[in-house]
Amino acid sequence: MKRIFALLLGVLFLVGCSSSQPKAPLAGKYKFEGISYTHVQHHEPTKFFYQSPKMVEKKYNKQILGALTKENLLDPNSSDELKIKITHRREFIGEATFAKSDRMGNIYLTYEVEVVRNGEVLRHYSSSELRFNPGVFGNLKGLVGQNNDDSLENKAISANVKEIVDTIKGMK
């Protein structure tokens, strides 16, 4: 009987420790001023020219603002502010070898989303590094070294924006 009582007491203790505090409710619409952008690139191409990091940042800002507006998630007078940090990494074929290529291999994304009210972080999400999947034909194009323009990167930006906005919509 003592063992059962001790076991029951232990289980109740562990259940009590595992419960979390209730989260403060969000306003549902957010104030958004723009992203914090970091561009990572370990190789500077000389044969092909790609869009500048400033252009990539502008595209992210424009598309995120458009998607948030479309989803009716923006309110400039909201008490909740949306802070988004994006790290966009370009990978070039062979960049880690002696046989570097100026053809783009892929795009990687890491992002953080915070909802802040009066300086207090109410929600925080941080992704691991995500690789853009251009599909079967896009991967084949990369394998044969045909990614020498901005099309791969523009598709990656659009897909990444969708991922970020879906994360924001999922924050409750």
Regions found by a protein language model. Give the residues of each.
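C-terminal/domain-edge helix-coil "capping" segments
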Residues: 22-25, 70-72, 132-172
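Sec-dependent bacterial lipoprotein signal peptides
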Residues: 1-19
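Surface-exposed short loop/turn segments
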Residues: 71, 76-147
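Sterically constrained small-residue positions within well-ordered secondary structures
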Residues: 8, 23-28, 75, 102-104
